[in-house]
């Protein structure tokens, strides 16, 4: 038989321990001012624990303040623990006072309160005290002072930090800016650019002829412009243009070569424009043709085969995607077969010893355009004027660099630009206005003469080339009619 007194004590101990656990959970979750049930109001163990909590509340917070004096924190915790034991209250092992993380908060992280479910607060993932300024308010706050105020501060601070993470960073930056307010800062961050270096060119007597600027210095960081080697490259091209220059007197061994060449070149311009090939392809094709005709005597009925084979060779040399030999054969209307074009290709290459290293005039024109600020109108007009030296028989034997310089000089005159200055002289290869005069007059004569190469003029009448042929012819007729000197015009 069980003793009724022992049963009563066991039941009281069971109910008091259960109630004690509830109170401890609420106290650890920052819940105070709890309303106790009337049925358990007279419980002596609960009354003792409540009085103990009130005494602790008067002495200070149960949660130790985060200071660097770890000895005082551990001493206060031990005294509070001893007080609870003297009153007959057994604390669980996972009590806040026995938690190792809270005994040394300076080296640990504190979990912020993020959600409240069924009157129970949850302490989730770690949030560093050094990362969040609002966490300090949570730790320093007394958990036994008001449920509403403590919970709202914790919840709002964490939510604001999640929704507006930039605000906390902005506060830190503002604090840093206040500390750095005494530092001097630069007034302007504009970096001054160095002006191009200028060089002077003098004659044999030491008299200054012209002054030019080093425009290649601005392309030092551009690997495609190869500014380190550009002077050596064009020096080599000027040497090479003399070697690959056809001779006009060698072409006179053919009968009626002047008229026949005009017809053939006009047809090649048509095919070249129809296939949409590069300008370099046409220049190389006609250079190969003139050099070949200067070495070999060709019958009149085979002249079209020579022109077709030369254009086929040039397209394979210059183009990325060259038209097939079938396309070239179809443009001759049966005058040349595919096998004949192949045989002509082999014979021409053997005659020229496979030397196709021709300094294209477009390279010299692009070089001069650098001194002209790469003006698109000047270069488009210059391309039309430069191509005149390709189709007109009188220009055979003139250096491509000289023709390119004369074309740029004439295009600038048409647009009313300034004089031929030192930069233009240097980047054209050193051609002065006096050296350009004969070639410029030849271009003027072609513009005012009746049209012979209709396909060539029709090509440059399109909007793609800004109607360069129409503008040039009208300008030349007006200048010739009024008797203006093209070499001193607009100066």
From Swiss-Prot:
The modification N-acetylserine is found at residue 2. Transmembrane segments: none annotated. Coiled coil: none annotated. Keywords: Acetylation, Cell cycle, Cell division, Cyclin, Mitosis. GO terms for molecular function: cyclin-dependent protein serine/threonine kinase regulator activity. Essential for the control of the cell cycle at the G2/M (mitosis) transition. Interacts with the CDC2 protein kinase to form MPF. G2/M cyclins accumulate steadily during G2 and are abruptly destroyed at mitosis. This is G2/mitotic-specific cyclin-2. Residues 67-77 have a biased composition (Polar residues). One of its GO terms (biological process) is cell division. Belongs to the cyclin family. Cyclin AB subfamily. Interacts with NAP1. It comes from Saccharomyces cerevisiae (strain ATCC 204508 / S288c). Disulfide bonds: none annotated. The keyword Nucleus does not apply. It holds the Pfam family Cyclin_N. Present with 339 molecules/cell in log phase SD medium. Residues 59-107, 164-184 are annotated as: Disordered. GO terms for cellular component: cellular bud neck; cyclin-dependent protein kinase holoenzyme complex; cytoplasm; microtubule organizing center; nucleus; spindle; spindle pole body.
């Amino acid at each position: 038989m069980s003793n009724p007194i022992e049963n009563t004590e066991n039941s009281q101990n069971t109910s008091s321990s259960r109630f004690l656990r509830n109170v401890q959970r609420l106290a650890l979750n920052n819940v105070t001012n709890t309303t106790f049930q009337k049925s358990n109001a007279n419980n002596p163990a609960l009354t003792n624990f409540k009085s103990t909590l009130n005494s602790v509340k008067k002495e200070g917070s149960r949660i130790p303040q985060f200071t660097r004096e770890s000895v005082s924190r551990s001493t206060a915790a031990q005294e509070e623990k001893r007080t609870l034991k003297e009153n007959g209250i057994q604390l669980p092992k996972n009590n806040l006072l026995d938690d190792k993380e809270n005994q040394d908060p300076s080296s640990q992280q504190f979990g912020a309160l993020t959600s409240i479910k069924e009157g129970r607060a949850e302490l989730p993932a770690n949030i560093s005290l050094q990362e969040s300024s609002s966490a300090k308010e949570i730790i320093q706050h007394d958990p036994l002072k008001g449920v509403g105020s403590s919970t709202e501060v914790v919840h709002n601070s964490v939510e604001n930090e999640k929704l507006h993470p930039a605000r906390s960073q902005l506060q830190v930056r503002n604090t840093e800016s206040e500390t750095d307010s005494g530092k001097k800062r630069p007034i302007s961050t504009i970096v001054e650019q160095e002006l191009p270096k200028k060089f002077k060119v003098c004659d044999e007597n030491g008299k200054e002829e012209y002054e030019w600027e080093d425009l290649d210095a601005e392309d030092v960081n551009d690997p495609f412009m190869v500014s380190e080697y550009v002077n050596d490259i064009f020096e080599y091209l000027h040497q090479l243009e003399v070697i690959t220059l056809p001779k006009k007197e060698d072409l006179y061994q053919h009968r009626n070569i002047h008229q026949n060449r005009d017809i053939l070149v006009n047809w090649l311009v048509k095919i070249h424009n129809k296939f949409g090939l590069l300008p370099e392809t046409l220049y190389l094709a006609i250079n190969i043709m003139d050099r070949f005709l200067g070495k070999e005597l060709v019958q009149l009925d085979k002249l079209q085969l020579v022109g077709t084979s030369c254009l086929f060779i040039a397209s394979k040399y210059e183009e990325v995607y060259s038209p097939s030999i079938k396309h070239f054969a179809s443009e001759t209307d049966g005058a040349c077969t595919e096998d004949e074009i192949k045989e002509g290709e082999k014979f021409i290459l053997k005659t020229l010893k496979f030397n196709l290293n021709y300094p294209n005039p477009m390279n010299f024109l692009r070089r001069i355009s650098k001194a002209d600020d790469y003006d698109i109108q000047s270069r488009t007009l210059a391309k039309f004027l430069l191509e005149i030296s390709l189709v007109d028989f009188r220009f055979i034997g003139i250096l491509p660099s000289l023709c390119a310089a004369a074309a740029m000089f004439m295009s600038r005159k048409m647009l009313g630009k300034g004089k031929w200055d030192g930069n233009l002289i240097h980047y054209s290869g050193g051609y002065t206005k006096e050296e350009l005069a004969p070639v410029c007059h030849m271009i003027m004569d072609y513009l005012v003469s009746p049209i012979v190469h209709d396909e060539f003029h029709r090509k440059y009448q399109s909007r793609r080339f800004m109607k360069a042929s129409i503008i040039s012819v009208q300008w030349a007729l007006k200048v010739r009619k009024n008797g203006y000197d093209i070499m001193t015009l607009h100066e």
